[in-house]
Amino acid sequence: MSFSAEAFWQTSTQEFLNLLNTGALAPKPEVIHFYGPSFMYYKTSYYSSKLTQFPTLSLTGTACALNCKHCESKVLETMQPTDTPEKLITIAEKLKQQGTFGLLLSGGCLPDGSIPLAGFVPAIEKIKRELCLTVFVHTGIISLEVAIALKNAGVDAALIDIIGSDETIKQIGNLNVTVKDYNNSLNALQQSGLNFVPHVIVGLHDGKLKGELDALKIIAAFKPSAIVVIAFMPIHGTTMAWVKPPQPVEIARVTAAARVMFPRTPLALGCVRPKGKDRVKTDILALKSSVDGIAFPSEEAIRYAEAQQYKFSFSSHCCAQIYMDAVQSV
């Protein structure tokens, strides 16, 4: 039985849930990969993360020119500041001594939506060459020149949020770019030869679905190494702190659409998604959508996977590691 993402995108909630419950959407993956990245303490009866193994560093400290309504630099405050190449190298060396095996390099954006990566390329190359750490990089809008430089420096994978609505880009992201710029960024990443993992954000437009299917269609013109679905999560102290986040079934529509559109591409439910009671539903619906991995899975979701006789593994990697893990487990 084959399914069209557009067709079930329009189905009623009950029809959609019935479809997921049949298990016919896509074959069950050989192994479910559960991730507990080091930027947040995570503990279940099955696994607990270690805070130094795969931390997130901000190349701009808490600075960001955009002041996006959903973040307002609050997310940057949770990262270790490494706002000069020298600081990046020094902190990477210390982390290596503490048992770190990988880094996620992130940061705030410039007015054009890019992250100022170019000045850090020599430091990244040194970290790869001398410390042999896995390095993932959030890119934002990116040029071919910078993408090639990251590839030559040895970056393992580039992570990029793809927004499929010009209105969302402008109203929420405070950005004067369009979906075409995200398309061009994916083209640059693919041309450079970098492994790249697009992220689709569910409910970024005031908690409502808008442009997520279009984002997947943009990605479909390329050959991503993996896809990660994340969801708007209200952050205390921001303009959107009181916005109701997307419901589990809305997040599931996007993960299911991604699975149907990319049947052979590793797919994960990422770390950013609503907390609380809805998290359990979100996680279990993701498993029913045949994702290959979940970051910070709820205890109940792990039990569900166990009851369904999934094989599963745990790791402190960033969940973008699914681009390798899912392929190796086949």
Regions found by a protein language model. Name each.
Residues 151-158, 193, 221-225, 285-293, ...:
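Glycine-enriched alpha-helix->loop->beta-strand junction motifs that scaffold or abut catalytic
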Residues 1-62, 66, 329:
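Flexible, acidic/Gly-rich N-terminal and inter-domain linker regions that tether
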Residues 46-55, 73-172, 176-196, 204-214, ...:
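Conserved Radical SAM active-site core
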Residues 180-240, 250-270, 297-298:
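Conserved C-terminal portion of the radical SAM core fold
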Residues 1-22, 279-284, 288-330:
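Radical SAM enzyme core and accessory elements
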Residues 68, 105, 258, 286:
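Conserved, mostly hydrophobic/aromatic
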Residues 113-115, 131-133, 176-181, 237-251, ...:
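Short acidic, glycine/proline-enriched helix-loop-strand junctions
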Residues 40, 139-143, 273-277, 297-300:
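Short beta->alpha connector loops
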